[in-house]
Swiss-Prot record:
It catalyses: Couples ATP hydrolysis with the unwinding of duplex DNA at the replication fork by translocating in the 5'-3' direction. This creates two antiparallel DNA single strands (ssDNA). The leading ssDNA polymer is the template for DNA polymerase III holoenzyme which synthesizes a continuous strand; ATP + H2O = ADP + phosphate + H(+). Its cofactor is [4Fe-4S] cluster. This is ATP-dependent DNA helicase DinG. Binds 1 [4Fe-4S] cluster. It comes from Escherichia coli O6:H1 (strain CFT073 / ATCC 700928 / UPEC).
Amino acid sequence: MALTAALKAQIAAWYKALQEQIPDFIPRAPQRQMIADVAKTLAGEEGRHLAIEAPTGVGKTLSYLIPGIAIAREEQKTLVVSTANVALQDQIYSKDLPLLKKIIPDLKFTAAFGRGRYVCPRNLTALASTEPTQQDLLAFLDDELTPNNQEEQKRCAKLKGDLDTYKWDGLRDHTDIAIDDDLWRRLSTDKASCLNRNCYYYRECPFFVARREIQEAEVVVANHALVMAAMESEAVLPDPKNLLLVLDEGHHLPDVARDALEMSAEITAPWYRLQLDLFTKLVATCMEQFRPKTIPPLAIPERLNAHCEELYELIASLNNILNLYMPAGQEAEHRFAMGELPDEVLEICQRLAKLTEMLRGLAELFLNDLSEKTGSHDIVRLHRLILQMNRALGMFEAQSKLWRLASLAQSSGAPVTKWATREEREGQLHLWFHCVGIRVSDQLERLLWRSIPHIIVTSATLRSLNSFSRLQEMSGLKEKAGDRFVALDSPFNHCEQGKIVIPRMRVEPSIDNEEQHIAEMAAFFREQVESKKHLGMLVLFASGRAMQRFLDYVTDLRLMLLVQGDQPRYRLVELHRKRVANGERSVLVGLQSFAEGLDLKGDLLSQVHIHKIAFPPIDSPVVITEGEWLKSLNRYPFEVQSLPSASFNLIQQVGRLIRSHGCWGEVVIYDKRLLTKNYGKRLLDALPVFPIEQPEVPEGIVKKKEKTKSPRRRRR
């Protein structure tokens, strides 16, 4: 479709009207360029997909929404905007789209959150009830749902009242009532525990109400994990050919895709035996009480028992083999080099893939049959079986995917990382098996790039070391396929608005020197606090260990420090804003996650402290396997993995400072390697152009370090 004169006029009219809605709106050339590039791509005038880096201040959200909505209307398609996290998803849904609705009054939009963000009305009713019959019913359905105390019951009753009177839409983030994680776990549900259309509350269920709204919406705000799942199952979202897709925070996509495709399962032999026994009994109950018209051959008791016995023997053999690779009787981990399994293990995995897939098919057949039963049956008993069969289906589905992935030598042209872990829980040792591909470009090509005609991938940071090459390698986007890569200029004058400060540290921030380095950092930080030049400050660390050691050095300043983990992030930011507004000094302290999505302008943040260059951890199974693979290709892992990742992290950290034309301040980086190592210049060259200062550092007095037992990493 060409960009017609009428379409261009519509986009221009909305953009002009928007300027009247935003106080102090400043027209910016990069924003106009982004609107034009997005429009050309979505209309099919230029290229297949567009990766566009839009630095802070460009106004990227409105720059893709305006042309996206106009073209979606013209082509009668749905515009899907996907983000990496719930916070940005909610911001677009609650702030940006309502703003656009002022200039597009008939705009219809909705949000598609994951099932776990919504309350389950069935569970809420049980927890809000004082009637024991409700709780007895849930117990019969194998759901232990009782309030822990009267206060919790009253809280749930208030939530139910708000839901029933439409004061609350059922989203966890949209209520002011405090809901701790333990209570929310019981209030929400997952796919395996949902009765779907068989549930009494189906028509009023917030999750399904939201899903039905998608069919009527012009704009759907989703997240990357949900989009990946929807493309895999062809559910939730409209047909890919009828979509326009924008992937905001697109730099997260490869990691989200990899996480979505990672498979893990417990394979402890006694536990596995119990699951198989429960399933055979479940099938027997279905055959006895709700016999299907057509009997699946595998449901015949003798055949099912023999099938499960073979499956158990394979699992038991695998337990014995894997345990040989790990020290006996304790928590441990074993990774298979280059993802290459011994022949014996590979043969077991291949056979397990076939056997678990057959059980998955049997569970699905019974579940479909049970779901079609009429009201002439005992509905409570039927629902109990549906829930149990649904959970069995979820287990065998995950197992089938795990063993299929374990059977692959490569995925997306790279090895599949495979490892086993032994973990202690409540005094018992449990064995787990894990698989994940180190590259997901083929899967992204199949699910997204080839399926959806035109996609916009955008973020304030898409490049590392001034290059799109890392994004191209990890995502599979490529110029040869017609994909375009654009980096917009920043609208800010960084030279005038701020500076980078690299203190003259005596030591590098290596593990051996960590204590002295943090002591020096704390001394310089204390000097900055005492100067009283800055009201709002942010301190970013590469590890929780280093953050804790720093806090040990500044205990007398603890009252002004708002530390990640003390409270939910949004509450820390709220408190920070209030303090600065009252003229008080306030310091946010956190890890890399605080370097994303934190938008504090002016005095709210005028000094950022960065502990050190944040190279990625090198001890995870995925990173180690990727390193082995790169070396086998005569590629240097530091250049391919570590340095681009560090550059990316540093760009994001430094990007916290200048958020508007009125922002000012300093970025203090406590890492002399930026000036002494060859790669330091490359890292600095990828940052906005700030003047650099190198002040002296007061001597830090090293504290005696208490011996602490470092926690063992359980997962990658």
